[in-house]
Amino acid sequence: MRIDGRKNEQIRHVKVTRHYTKYAEGSVYIEVGDTKVLCNVSIEDKVPPFMKGTGSGWITAEYNMLPRSTETRKIRDIARLKIDGRTMEIQRLIGRALRSVVDLKALGEKTLWIDCDVIQADGGTRTTAISGAFIALVDAVNKLHKIKPFKIYPIRSFVAAVSVGIVNEEKILDLCYQEDSKAKVDMNIIMTDEGSFVEVQGTGEESPYTRTELNELLDLGEKGIKQMINVQKESLKMDSLWIGTGGNN
């Protein structure tokens, strides 16, 4: 029996609140169990210098944990005058995940800033951020599309992320913090609704893991991705109809 009574192949309860803040073009507050993340998407009518003149857009992300999102206060990055390695790794991961399902050429020379702020952390903050940020991204792109329809709708597919791991020799989905801290193997999986992998991050925390265990964890992760994408679709409802069509109807 897991800490919260879930089955091994079950994700935590997910609650999505769209249009959470007033000013951002896309804003989602996502709760996965006790992990809570605010995902805002802002649009700029310019691109980084390395993208100028290409006709393509860009998507970049910033990730931050509020000081009391954890059991003990976390010092703000600004107070240390540097971004820690974990934060840098996660925000790059979020950016890669979202760029993987967007036709940047179709987007045009615009930058979409993804800001993910962890309000409360109980495991899976990076996966929660990716899954929530995708919904906010759709809202932001749809806002552009309604003002001036894209010739080709830029978002090609859904993308979501989940964690899997081996705890007490059990393979489990969507680890909370207590489970994550005891995991023999910890893995983050990012996939599209078409079943394609975007990224797999797997670590043998206590010991190596076998190819068989890897395959079983990937299968478990795929089940979790389907559950999370169903949540995304239910949240977006009719606003998801353009995804993958390439059209402007």
Curated annotation (Swiss-Prot):
Q: Where does phosphate bind?
A: R86, G124, T125, R126
| One Gene Ontology MF term | 3'-5'-RNA exonuclease activity
In terms of InterPro entries, this protein maps to: ExoRNase_PH_dom1 (IPR001247), ExoRNase_PH_dom2 (IPR015847), ExoRNase_PH_dom2_sf (IPR036345), PNPase/RNase_PH_dom_sf (IPR027408), Ribosomal_Su5_D2-typ_SF (IPR020568), RNase_PH (IPR050080), RNase_PH_bac-type (IPR002381), RNase_PH_CS (IPR018336)
Q: Which keywords are on file for this protein?
A: Nucleotidyltransferase, RNA-binding, rRNA processing, Transferase, tRNA processing, tRNA-binding
Identify the PROSITE patterns for this entry: RIBONUCLEASE_PH
- Enzyme Commission number(s): 2.7.7.56
Q: Which GO terms describe its biological process?
A: rRNA catabolic process; rRNA processing; tRNA processing
Coiled-coil intervals, chain numbering: none
Q: Cite the CDD domains for this sequence.
A: RNase_PH_bact
The UniProt catalytic activity note for this protein reads: tRNA(n+1) + phosphate = tRNA(n) + a ribonucleoside 5'-diphosphate
Q: Name one Pfam family in it.
A: RNase_PH
SUPFAM superfamilies in UniProt: Ribonuclease PH domain 2-like, Ribosomal protein S5 domain 2-like
As for family, the record states: Belongs to the RNase PH family.
Check the record and name the HAMAP family matching this protein: RNase_PH
User: What task does this protein carry out?
Assistant: Phosphorolytic 3'-5' exoribonuclease that plays an important role in tRNA 3'-end maturation. Removes nucleotide residues following the 3'-CCA terminus of tRNAs; can also add nucleotides to the ends of RNA molecules by using nucleoside diphosphates as substrates, but this may not be physiologically important. Probably plays a role in initiation of 16S rRNA degradation (leading to ribosome degradation) during starvation.
Q: How does it assemble?
A: Homohexameric ring arranged as a trimer of dimers.
* This protein's name: Ribonuclease PH
Annotated source species: Clostridium botulinum (strain Alaska E43 / Type E3)
